[in-house]
Amino acid sequence: MVLTNLTKYSDFGLLIIRVGLGVTFMLHGYPKLTAGREMWEGLGGGLGLPIPVVFGFVAALSEFLGGLMLIGGVFFRVALILLIGVMAGAITYHVKAGDGFKGYAHALELLIVFAGLLFTGPGKYSVDRK
């Protein structure tokens, strides 16, 4: 009985998802962002990209700012595209490293969640609410 009434709180559910994932991505992104050039070089270099320091910095910045934007629901779909890019990079890194499914499964799961959220929108408890 109680569970059937929860659909009227779907916007609250979206808030929980946004804040939970946003905080997690900020906590993962901040150390990468503040670690400096050597970290950025490693992030970008692990993917075999040209100018690895630039791509590594962009990945770290996307992870941190994407998380922040997710929390507030501001530029929500832009944030999701940034985070999908970060997860695609993580998947690529793990596949190239030969880590197997267990190595990239978490990044794939998050990419799928972010892709789904592109269609739901941020919910009414957000800056982007309509």
Residue locations for each model-derived region?
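Extended, low-polarity transmembrane helix blocks
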Residues: 1-34, 53-61, 65-130
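Membrane-interface interhelical connector segments
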Residues: 31-51
